[in-house]
Amino acid sequence: MNMTINEDALNWYKEELDLESGDQVRFFVRYGGCSNVQKGFSLGVAKDAPQEAGVTAEADGITFFIEESDLWYFDNHDLLVSYSEDADEPVFEYQ
């Protein structure tokens, strides 16, 4: 599995989470919400340090990661995190 954070999404996260180079951001599975890959689950986001990262992506010195224990959620899809100007929020695309 691969994870990509595009530049517009990176800038949104930097502003919203007050991120700096060296920070770490976790994408985690949460119950509820809406997803194209796992019904009844969605992704949450938090500043956190990895315990057992399964996938990482670095952008502008910031490490984005998904724990090994959450990889089931992606069902062998790659994750592209982009940004929607209309919604003014990141968009998760499963490829």
UniProtKB/Swiss-Prot annotation:
Database matches in InterPro entries: FeS_biogenesis (IPR000361), HesB-like_dom_sf (IPR035903), PdhI-like (IPR008326)
SUPFAM superfamilies: HesB-like domain (SSF89360)
Knockout consequences: Knockout mutant does not have growth defects compared to the wild-type when grown with glucose as the main carbon source.
Protein task: Acts as an inhibitor of the pyruvate dehydrogenase. Overexpression does not affect growth with glucose as the main carbon source, but it leads to a dramatic growth defect when cells are grown with pyruvate as the sole carbon source.
Family: Belongs to the HesB/IscA family.
Summary of subunit composition and partner proteins: Interacts with the E1 module of pyruvate dehydrogenase (PdhA-PdhB).
Listed name of the protein: Pyruvate dehydrogenase inhibitor
Organism: Bacillus subtilis (strain 168)
Gene it is expressed from: pdhI
